[in-house]
Amino acid sequence: MPVRRGHVAPQNTYLDTIIRKFEGQSRKFLIANAQMENCAIIYCNDGFCELFGYSRVEVMQQPCTCDFLTGPNTPSSAVSRLAQALLGAEECKVDILYYRKDASSFRCLVDVVPVKNEDGAVIMFILNFEDLAQLLAKCSSRSLSQRLLSQSFLGSEGSHGRPGGPGPGTGRGKYRTISQIPQFTLNFVEFNLEKHRSSSTTEIEIIAPHKVVERTQNVTEKVTQVLSLGADVLPEYKLQAPRIHRWTILHYSPFKAVWDWLILLLVIYTAVFTPYSAAFLLSDQDESRRGACSYTCSPLTVVDLIVDIMFVVDIVINFRTTYVNTNDEVVSHPRRIAVHYFKGWFLIDMVAAIPFDLLIFRTGSDETTTLIGLLKTARLLRLVRVARKLDRYSEYGAAVLFLLMCTFALIAHWLACIWYAIGNVERPYLEHKIGWLDSLGVQLGKRYNGSDPASGPSVQDKYVTALYFTFSSLTSVGFGNVSPNTNSEKVFSICVMLIGSLMYASIFGNVSAIIQRLYSGTARYHTQMLRVKEFIRFHQIPNPLRQRLEEYFQHAWSYTNGIDMNAVLKGFPECLQADICLHLHRALLQHCPAFSGAGKGCLRALAVKFKTTHAPPGDTLVHLGDVLSTLYFISRGSIEILRDDVVVAILGKNDIFGEPVSLHAQPGKSSADVRALTYCDLHKIQRADLLEVLDMYPAFAESFWSKLEVTFNLRDAAGGLHSSPRQAPGSQDHQGFFLSDNQSDAAPPLSISDASGLWPELLQEMPPRHSPQSPQEDPDCWPLKLGSRLEQLQAQMNRLESRVSSDLSRILQLLQKPMPQGHASYILEAPASNDLALVPIASETTSPGPRLPQGFLPPAQTPSYGDLDDCSPKHRNSSPRMPHLAVATDKTLAPSSEQEQPEGLWPPLASPLHPLEVQGLICGPCFSSLPEHLGSVPKQLDFQRHGSDPGFAGSWGH
């Protein structure tokens, strides 16, 4: 797998940088978009919300002139200066009287700072707010010694000046007076009021408020002076690569890769030559020879010294090499890198880099040879580097086999050195020359001579023979030509056989299992990567987009390690799944105010429905026109919301975007694009899943709806999938029958198409209706046209009532038994001609009754859903004159009574103003957790077709 590079894609870290610089300074600021018509507020921090008492939802999209903060005592001149500064895109300090949400007022010092993009155009404004009373209180609370010290400096300047110099009219006097005012600049560094010069509390109180206004309105500092910092203080609003410290080396840079390979070769050299040098090359004659010359006589010693220097340099480089923390962030700060290295591999690297043979050179001790040999083995600690460097290749089968073979050979080399050391140390003390070195000398004809230290086999003969013995013992071959004779040699041989059996069984016996295990993750990675590359090649994706795809895939793989969370969770029981999901989403469920007060069972049910998504910079989460079926919660990173490529809002951690589910019964469409500025982690939940859980916990639903604050509502107010049940008259979703304010709460209106399906005569006399989006109509004329249409509909209703009266005789012929007095019912008759007719059903002594005013029923007289389901016309709150609609055919016509329904009749239909809960007429979910007026939203009734249509008659049983 590739090197873990961390978050290296270009990111727009504008908001993150601002918040990070403001941390710990108690700033209250907001950000406004200068490219919008009213400079709308696109972000405000928590300090601003706490200062004024408004929530972020209430502040977003407000004009940055902050008219909602003004009151009756707010001076218009200050408001004008603020507006003029925003209009002219210039820096300004304004002292203004603002009001909090609780109607309390206070004097506020506002700093206006324009933000320019890379082209030099002002695109945003940062407005910082400070309570002037708090600033004065901070200055007055300084210690007496500090105030005396500041007064001594100011007093010496004023008392020892020339006569008339410090007068109030001179420039020096003005400067001194202004210096006594607590100066405020929008600093991103540590802000310390103790550093500002001022006089005593009494001198501060002498300055009149209008004088402060006069001096603060003429501030003309540049942005760099206002911010009092360098270039990295206020970043440009654009995609920026992660900033790296000047003298820091990236851990994935080409230089670091070459250096790592060089260090790897040096480690291998150390692992091979250190045991060989300690066992074979250090002897008494070698030590005496070294004592006669300098340290650089032996070439191998010089090479060891160079290797030690290289490892010391590597330690220094490690102190300046970036690393990736647990949040996948590239850390380049030198202090954090040093702390991380100290806690990690520093101790091992430091011990392995000590040149012990150089430190004890020419000590003159007899134990020098043994001590040097033992201390040289400390360099083997550098093998830990091999594990670190070669870990990335552990998933490749060929590399694993090669590493295993190298490990086997290295262990055999070490054992050979130990085998020779045992024979060499034991040989002088043996009475009978039976050691393996003496046997080797006899076989080679190079016997040892006690008087000649240089006698015996050569170093090469001894090393090759020892290596041959260890390899034959490890592989359990053992030809016997080199055999252990002494007890020490036999004990060592037993240990070698045990090690060999374990290595042989674990490595060579399980090669196929090792390859299969190591290939499992790599095979999945390369399979997915191959699909991505084939997709890029087939569709000819351009290089910039191709790089984004590959980087996102690699980052997503390192983020999830190729684990499919859904597949993993399916293998566990539901109770354990809920616990796992509750742990994964614990930060959101614990800190979001909307979920406070929820029981453990409710939180578990919500956690199962939540999904986690990760977005790289530049990724579009929601497009314009997308159906808003998901609610998003930001847990890390920042996003921007754009309309026509203009930023209308910037959201960060703990913000929520989508649509307020409680205000709309059906999902709407997005009115903007949502794009990630940085690497973002988001929690999302489907609308239907949220409502399903809240239906199961109705007690928590009310608390949730009241506490849920959607930071930015993406719903397009001009349209949606279905018309909202509580849309105001004049909306484009329905233009037929409109209800009054109190009637709109009771039932949704019936559209003109519904009425024309029942009575086709209406359609002939109605004027042609144009789409509200047609350019022929002016939106200002809609109320007049709607009023005229209502009058026409009223006239049509009057004519329909007269027709009902004329058809009374026909209804009387169909009655088989008398009806109770005081009630009149209406049925829809479908005779053989398949023509629908609205006719009343009444007894012979019952008059049709007075017509309904305006053709509508008051809400209290409208039948409820439960009454309709029970098919019972008994309504205590219903008027005696309220009609009950029923559908009848030639075969099922029967008298309709208020006390019973004859068999064969359809259940009584509701008022035309009510949704019908008849199977086949209504489609759509009903969520009891929604507010009462959004509980059930029917689709349009299937009454548009005329009764003569055969399909219509078939639907009623013909």
Swiss-Prot record:
It catalyses: K(+)(in) = K(+)(out). The gene is KCNH6. Residues 41-70 form the PAS domain. Residues 720-751, 845-910 are annotated as: Disordered. A motif (Selectivity filter) lies at residues 476-481. It comes from Homo sapiens (Human). This is Voltage-gated inwardly rectifying potassium channel KCNH6. Coiled coil: none annotated. Residues 594-694 are annotated as: cNMP-binding domain. It is found in: Cell membrane.
